[in-house]
Amino acid sequence: MHHFYDQLCPSCAALNYTKRSELADMSGMVVLLTGGRVKIGYQAGIKLLRCGAKLIVATRFARDAAERYAAEPDFADWGDRLEIFGLDLRHIPSVEAFCTHLLKTRTRLDAIVNNACQTVRRPPGFYEHMMNRETAALELLPANVLQLVGSYETLRSVAPSRPLGEDGIVAPKLPAAEAINVPGLTRAAELSQTALLPEDHLTAASLFPAGQLDQDLQQLDLRGRNSWRLRLHEVSAVELLETQLVNAVAPFVLNARLKPLMEATPGVHKHVVNVSAVEGQFYRLRKTTKHPHTNMAKAALNMMTRTSATDYHDSGINMNSVDTGWVSDEDPVAIAEAKIAEQRFHPPLDIVDGAARIVDPIIDGLNTGTHVWGQFLKDYTSTDW
């Protein structure tokens, strides 16, 4: 048995363990990463920064993300190459505005990693504990946190104008009229508190106990049932649409609108990574009857890759879908804990493994000179769609 993995064969274990720490020289390259605040996305962000890349992270909770990155022991080595923007991918006009901002202020973009996804929908109470931080006056923020969100705060007209670190271009503020129309960009965190369904009014401390966080330092969610267990007739229209927007529509917009910026970046090393899952795979022998809406969204994302990879490859952009592997248990806490107690269950991989997989097309391509494209990648190799 491998010293780290207890559910992988020896050769797979050796490969996965090597990939966990593999880096490449990405000096001077710029990467956009969505969903880079926690779990796989956060670990992917750290890996890219340690490769030397300049990283733009998009997340609903920019200040919380900044605190997490700033707490890393080697923050001083790469903190000046990280920018964090607040963005709610459920609001597509805001995604369009964010793309416009990047097109106006950036001179290159080497990779897009569409990592953000909505698998289990959480009510506002799940995020409430972060709101004081996300709405606090700027002068209350630590200097290292303000450093990371400075461009974002300028964009949404909260902070004084300040130059971007890349080339001295002064970050523009959004016109007041436009700022009102793109709350997913200017008030990304606050939108999480908008109640759209009856269950969104659940604020009981018994469900979201104050001060209790899970292993990913997220609010503990003690609801007895969540999205992962829903069947077709149980999924609300709101959840269906949100899942499609975050998992498929927003990546579509980012890939489409930012293509000119990637085309203006010289080289054939460029990548678009659409983070997918086997739930979106048609050639899979067994399917459960649960979470059809998330399956649909990942299938749609895969079809974007399948359709557009050739077109993007003609511009030196290598587009792939990548499965993260089984790294987490999405079941409600009570069910997950029962499986641990009764079956000693745990996923075969962890979030570092998942992060290594989604950035591997970039890192492996740079290290080997062979950039794969047009593939659905699982376990570091091509698999069926």
Predicted regions and their residues:
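Rossmann-fold cofactor-recognition segment
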Residues: 73-93, 175-186, 190-193, 197-198, ...
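Active-site-adjacent segment of SDR/Rossmann-fold oxidoreductases
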Residues: 106, 307-317
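Hydrophobic positions on the long internal alpha-helix
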Residues: 113, 243, 254-258, 304-305
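C-terminal helical subdomain
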Residues: 156-157, 162-207, 338-385
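Canonical Rossmann dinucleotide-binding motif of NAD(H)/NADP(H)-dependent dehydrogenases/reductases
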Residues: 17-62
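Conserved glycine-rich Rossmann-like NAD(P)H-binding loop of the short-chain dehydrogenase/reductase
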Residues: 51-69, 80-86, 111-116, 121-150
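Active-site helix of classical SDR
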Residues: 255, 293, 297
